[in-house]
Swiss-Prot record:
Residues 682-692 have a biased composition (Acidic residues). This is Probable basic-leucine zipper transcription factor N. The keyword Nucleus applies. Keywords: Coiled coil, DNA-binding, Nucleus, Transcription, Transcription regulation. Residues 286-302, 348-406 have a biased composition (Polar residues). Residues 602-632 are annotated as: Basic motif. Its main location: nucleus. Residues 601-664 form the bZIP domain. It comes from the Eukaryota. It comes from Dictyostelium discoideum (Social amoeba).
Length: 999
């Protein structure tokens, strides 16, 4: 808005918006250059703020600023007051700070003197002497030269933008190469990955409801296919995924080509518009060139000071003009181009528009500042204010000068050459992108030749992937062409606020118009600018394609959820990925609730069934896997126990050898061997060692390297626990106690069998043969093969080899009571009867075979060993020889005995004294002892298997009740050990039913 100069006193302006009082009146200087005699000099006083109008015609003035003051001088003077934007009351007499004296004369030359310090202009216009053609030429020429200047600046900015685009393109090409390399690595890794099943020695995998749910549920729909076929189907699925990805890539390439064609069409349209604009500018320049000459740059002009109440940032009219009229037909018109404003001064129809200003409320930056003046003698005085925003328009040929704060206007038309360069660069960039697309197509074709061997099946359409977020460098050049490009310099924030609050401006009134027009807002032409950064847009689909490839390749086995049949129940090993494709969410989508609302009842039922199948199959595989792990753990424990036992035996032998070595070093003699044939004298030491080891285990002073026997709970404790579990705890706890009870009996039975096997050795059997007393008649008979002789078993039971059918068995009294108490059903009774018959038959065979083996072993000792000793009773040497020979042969031929031969008599030659019949007899003895050990093992297996089968027949509660009854009722008269308890269970089963044929 305009500011008023103080009215009282004279002031001097120092150029810093400050006034200083002056004692002497300021001398005013005017540029008066006239060539005619009839000059009318009108001097305007600094303190005079009045407008003298000699004509009573209608005068209209429109000032730049927020306060619009209209003065109608029809023979009187009007004073107006208004408020500025900061609330200061400003009294304005007609036209503040721009005082104009208008003297209308006919055929008289007017000399207008303008005071530079106070911005007062005296303009004498001649009526009907203003020419509209001159004004139009001035406006067009000034606009044309401003456009040339703006185009030069545009070229610089476009070059910078093109350089930035090239850098961005290089970065994007590098990113594309890196992403392509990553995609190839992922594809190779996926091809090499195999389906990890839980069969055999491979791991079991993960839970079915993990990130990749689709394949897990599909695998549960068919449990009849093995893991190998599932792996083959998975390979087919991966190949079909690759096919789908390649088709998507081809579609994306086609879309990119279409976009490129559209961009080329847009560029052609831009070229046509630029040619039209250039054709419009060229005739204006040619028509205006003969009227004007080259201007001369002048010094700067001081700006009009601003009042203290109004900030200095508000644009004001700070330039003053001294215009000298040299002819009768000259009319001085001021055109303000700084803010795209044109001031028309004419006397036609007595309408005068003093000034028309447009601060460019739709613009974002000021325009170049130019001022030019011309005198009558051909000399030019140009004033370019250093702090001005409204320069004076030129009255001659213009060549604008720009300051450092100048910026490019928003709406402009670039040169044809510059546009061609931009188009060429864009075409080069498009060619590079096409080459990249060709490379991608070649890679896709190579992958198809290597991997695709089967026709593609229909798939569900994938939803478009979201484009990756662009970096700020990419987002900045990709602005909408409708929005103006941001210039390097911006207006102050206060200036933008004042521009937004300005009132509507009246349109420009041409000199040919007669009636005044109503105020209307200025309409700027919608000129379409070329999109300089349009070359970056084709790269976006490439980035989207690369992102889709990465997401699709990372989601393994998630395609064809609706068309692929159920394969197998094997649980594969899946990768936990953050991204999911739409196909993987067909059965279990990411937004479960929303998808559930759109599914039909049939689909919901199918999904629930597949989930149940997957859960059940997983539990089965998990149980199988746990059993395999437990079996392996048992094998490892047994191997560890065996190694501990071997270490213990080796240490014992080493200790014995060291003891004998110390005896021999000290000069002593080794202890004599036993006189009993087959005995070495070390058996007693072994028994003593075993007793000593047992005592150390109980005291806790055993050697840490020796094998430790784990202490197990007593049988009475387990029976009491079973009684409590039957009444209080659940079935699972009862089953756990039964398993512990079974393992305790089994371990104790194994230990008992190992101790029995120690008796089966030549020395112990010789002692047992001597204890028999009476020798049977078979001792004197020659040795015969036992298979040729048929011996009758004196201890045979009355039950024959062919037992009666189990249906004919009658239950005993106690078994009937137990069946009633335990609620045994008829099917269980039949199975118990079958078990009783089978175990009874096997037990009878084992006992019969053992009796036969014992008789043969004793007959062997009486006929072969003891008989030779009696016959050679007088010869001690032969006795020792026979004893030593028999001892050596028996201990070396028997592999299961724990005795070892220490020494052999040095005066006996084994090769000379042992004949072939004797050697055959020793082999026979070792075979008999081995058979006896096998018989003991068979009996142990029969007892354990009988108890196991009973557990399968009875329920946990019935089994616990059966054990407690045996322990409390049947064997309550005496305390039974764990081994006797196992035999008691067998006997209870054996005597549960009675065969009526043998009663």
């Amino acid at each position: 808005m305009y500011q008023s100069i103080p009215q009282q006193g004279n002031y001097i302006y120092n150029g810093n918006n400050n006034f200083f009082p002056q004692q002497q009146p300021q001398q005013q200087q005017y540029l008066n250059n006239s060539n005619n005699n009839n000059n009318n000099n009108n001097n305007n006083n600094n303190n005079n703020n009045n407008i003298n109008n000699n004509n009573n015609n209608f005068q209209q003035s429109y000032n730049n600023g927020n306060n619009n003051n209209y003065n109608n001088n029809n023979g009187y003077q009007q004073q107006t007051s208004s408020y500025d934007m900061y609330g200061n009351n400003v009294n304005i007499n007609n036209n503040n700070n721009n005082n104009v004296n208008i003297n209308s004369q006919n055929n008289v030359n007017n000399n207008n003197n303008n005071n530079n310090n106070n911005n007062n202009g005296n303009i004498n216009n001649n009526m009907l002497m203003a020419t509209s053609s001159a004004l139009n030429n001035i406006v067009k020429v000034t606009n044309g030269y401003q456009q040339q200047q703006q185009q030069q600046l545009l070229q610089q900015t476009t070059q910078q933008q093109l350089q930035q685009q090239q850098q961005l393109l290089q970065q994007q090409q590098q990113q594309i190469q890196q992403q392509q390399a990553a995609l190839q690595l992922q594809l190779e890794q996926q091809q090499q990955q195999k389906m990890v099943l839980m069969f055999g020695d491979e791991p079991m995998g993960y839970l079915p409801f993990s990130e990749d749910k689709n394949l897990m549920l599909l695998s549960a729909l068919n449990t009849n296919v093995d893991g190998g076929s599932f792996y083959g189907i998975q390979q087919q699925q991966q190949q079909q995924q690759l096919q789908q990805q390649q088709l998507q890539q081809q579609q994306q390439l086609q879309q990119q080509q279409q976009q490129l064609q559209q961009q080329q069409i847009q560029q052609q349209q831009i070229q046509q518009q630029q040619q039209q604009q250039q054709q419009q500018i060229s005739p204006i320049q040619e028509s205006a060139s003969p009227y004007y000459s080259t201007p001369i740059q002048s010094n700067t002009m001081l700006s009009i000071p601003s009042s203290p109440g109004i900030p200095s940032s508000i644009p004001q009219l700070n330039n003053s003009n001294n215009i000298n009229n040299n002819s009768n037909n000259n009319n001085n018109n001021n055109n303000n181009n700084n803010n795209n404003n044109i001031n028309y001064n004419s006397n036609m129809a007595s309408n005068f528009i003093s000034q028309h200003s447009n601060n460019g409320s739709n613009t974002s930056s000021p325009v170049p500042q130019t001022t030019y003046l011309q005198n009558s003698g051909g000399n030019f005085n140009a004033y370019n204010g250093s702090n001005t925003n409204s320069p004076i328009t030129p009255s001659s040929y213009l060549q604008p000068t720009t300051s450092q704060d100048q910026v490019i206007p928003q709406q402009l038309s670039p040169n044809h050459d510059q546009n061609q360069q931009i188009i060429q660069q864009q075409q080069k960039i498009l060619q590079q992108q096409q080459q990249q697309q060709l490379l991608l197509q070649q890679q896709i074709q190579q992958q198809q030749q290597q991997q695709l061997h089967q026709p593609q099946s229909p798939q569900l359409p994938q939803s478009p992937q979201q484009s990756p977020q662009q970096s700020p460098q990419q987002l900045q050049p990709q602005q909408s062409p409708q929005q103006p490009q941001q210039q390097p310099q911006q207006q102050p924030q206060q200036l933008q606020q004042t521009q937004q609050k300005t009132v509507q401006r009246p349109p420009i009134i041409q000199p040919t118009t007669i009636q005044p027009q109503s105020p209307q807002p200025p309409q700027q032409p919608q000129q379409k600018q070329p999109t300089i950064n349009s070359s970056i847009t084709p790269i976006q689909p490439i980035q989207q394609m690369i992102q889709q490839l990465t997401q699709n390749s990372s989601t393994k086995s998630t395609s064809k959820a609706s068309n692929i049949p159920a394969t197998t129940a094997a649980c594969p090993k899946v990768d936990l990925l953050p991204n999911k494709s739409p196909i993987s969410s067909y059965i279990l989508p990411h937004d479960f609730e929303e998808t559930l609302a759109h599914l039909s009842e049939k689909q919901k039922t199918r999904r629930r069934a597949s989930q149940n199948l997957a859960s059940r199959n997983y539990r089965q595989r998990k149980k199988q896997y746990v059993n395999e792990v437990e079996d392996r753990l048992d094998d490892i424990v047994q191997e560890n126990e065996r190694l501990k036992k071997e270490l213990y035996d080796s240490k014992k032998i080493l200790k014995k050898l060291l003891h004998e070595n110390n005896i021999l070093k000290s000069g002593g003699q080794l202890p004599n061997k036993s006189d009993i044939p087959g005995c070495t004298g070390s058996e007693d030491e072994d028994e003593d060692d075993f007793d000593q080891f047992d005592q150390q285990q109980q005291d806790g002073s055993a050697d840490p390297s020796t094998p430790v026997v784990e202490t197990e709970p007593d049988i009475s404790v387990l029976v009491d626990r079973l009684q409590v579990d039957m009444s209080i705890t659940t079935q699972d706890d009862l089953t756990t106690t039964l398993k512990q009870f079974y393992s305790t009996l089994k371990n104790r039975q194994d230990l008992y069998i190992n101790q029995i096997k120690q008796i089966v050795n030549p020395c112990t059997q010789a002692k047992l043969a001597l204890l028999d007393g009476e020798i049977s008649p078979a001792q004197s008979c020659p040795f015969e093969d036992p298979s040729e002789k048929q011996h009758s078993d004196p201890n045979s039971s009355p039950i024959g080899d062919m037992p009666s059918p189990y249906e004919q068995l009658e239950p005993t009294k106690w078994w009937s009571n137990f069946c009633n108490e335990a609620n045994i059903n008829p099917e269980q009774e039949n199975r118990v009867r079958q078990l009783r018959q089978e175990s009874n038959l096997r037990h009878k065979k084992i006992i019969k075979e053992r009796t036969h083996l014992n008789r043969e072993i004793r007959e062997y000792y009486h006929s072969k060993v003891f008989n030779g000793t009696v016959n050679n009773g007088g010869n001690t040497k032969s006795k020792k020889t026979a004893a030593s020979t028999s001892t050596t042969t028996t201990t070396t031929s028997t592999s299961t005995t724990t005795t070892t031969t220490t020494t052999i008599s040095t005066d006996v030659d084994i090769s000379n004294n042992i004949s072939s019949p004797v050697q055959s007899h020793l082999v026979q003895l070792s075979g008999l002892l081995d058979k006896l050990k096998e018989n003991i093992d068979h009996e142990n297996e029969t007892l354990i298997q009988t108890y196991e089968k009973l557990g399968f027949i009875l329920s946990p509660f019935q089994e616990a009740l059966f054990i407690t009854k045996i322990y409390n009722n049947i064997f309550s008269e005496s305390s039974y050990s764990n081994i006797q308890m196992l035999h008691g269970i067998k006997d209870a089963i054996l005597y549960s039913y009675v065969d009526p044929t043998y009663t």
